[in-house]
Amino acid sequence: MRLGLFGGSFDPPHVGHLLVAQDALEALRLDHLLIIPAAQQPLKGAHQTSAHHRLAMVRACFEGVQGIEVDPVEIERGGLSFMVDTVEAVRRRWPDAHLHLLVGRDVVPTLPRWHDVDRLLSMVRLVVLTRDAAPQEGPLLIDAESDSGVVAEVLSTRQVDMSSTEIRSRVRDGRSIRGFVPDAVATYIASTGLYREYPRGSADTERSERA
């Protein structure tokens, strides 16, 4: 069984996340892809929308998408979200699965700061997501820690010019987010009043800066 893991703050989840997940599911020939919202990311700033709101939005975003499941493992565990702990929990559920961990290219430089990164990378195949216009073929060598390196697959996904930061800013400024998020997510944001008073300059939380 080929199982993918796609984690992040998803604050909020948007169409780009949805397209990337679908591209990964197809291109990597995954049997299943887990979307894993973080409870609290160690490498992110303090301001983050509450976990129950983000989980509800992620479920709305991916509802009905075949092959994709929202897994609340990190939110249910609480505290700081260390990916190595999440992977171990997933392995206990699917001991025979081949695990593929999806991360954004912008996250690669943070790998040396991830908690117990060597053990993490021994349990998964790392897949680096890129939105380059021209797909890069072949493996990518990443300096994971000190002088060591890991070989990762590079997956070129559809280019989507949007970010969670931009969406939060648009909501705060009273502008439309139609086309940025699925309708169900837009409805949730409107009904709960999320992001209307979100602080300016908040760090982008959209893609997998884990630890």
Swiss-Prot record:
Q: Name the source's superkingdom.
A: Bacteria
Question: What is an example of a GO molecular function annotated in this UniProt entry?
Answer: nicotinate-nucleotide adenylyltransferase activity
Q: What is this protein called?
A: Probable nicotinate-nucleotide adenylyltransferase
What processes in GO biological process is this protein linked to? NAD biosynthetic process
Instruction: Detail the disulphide connectivity of this chain as listed in its UniProt entry.
Output: none
Q: What class of enzyme is it?
A: transferase
What CDD domains does the annotation carry?
Answer: NMNAT
Keyword field: ATP-binding, NAD, Nucleotide-binding, Nucleotidyltransferase, Pyridine nucleotide biosynthesis, Transferase
E.C. number(s) listed in UniProt: 2.7.7.18
What Pfam families does the record tag this protein with? Answer: CTP_transf_like
Pathway annotation: Cofactor biosynthesis; NAD(+) biosynthesis; deamido-NAD(+) from nicotinate D-ribonucleotide: step 1/1
Q: Which InterPro entries match?
A: Cyt_trans-like, NadD/NMNAT, Rossmann-like_a/b/a_fold
Q: What does the record give as the organism's lineage? A: Bacteria, Pseudomonadati, Gemmatimonadota, Gemmatimonadia, Gemmatimonadales
Function per UniProt? Catalyzes the reversible adenylation of nicotinate mononucleotide (NaMN) to nicotinic acid adenine dinucleotide (NaAD).
Q: Which reaction does it catalyse?
A: nicotinate beta-D-ribonucleotide + ATP + H(+) = deamido-NAD(+) + diphosphate
What NCBIfam families does the annotation carry?
cyt_tran_rel (TIGR00125), nicotinate (nicotinamide) nucleotide adenylyltransferase (TIGR00482), PRK00071.1-3 (NF000840)
Q: Which family is this protein grouped under?
A: Belongs to the NadD family.
Q: Which SUPFAM superfamilies match?
A: Nucleotidylyl transferase
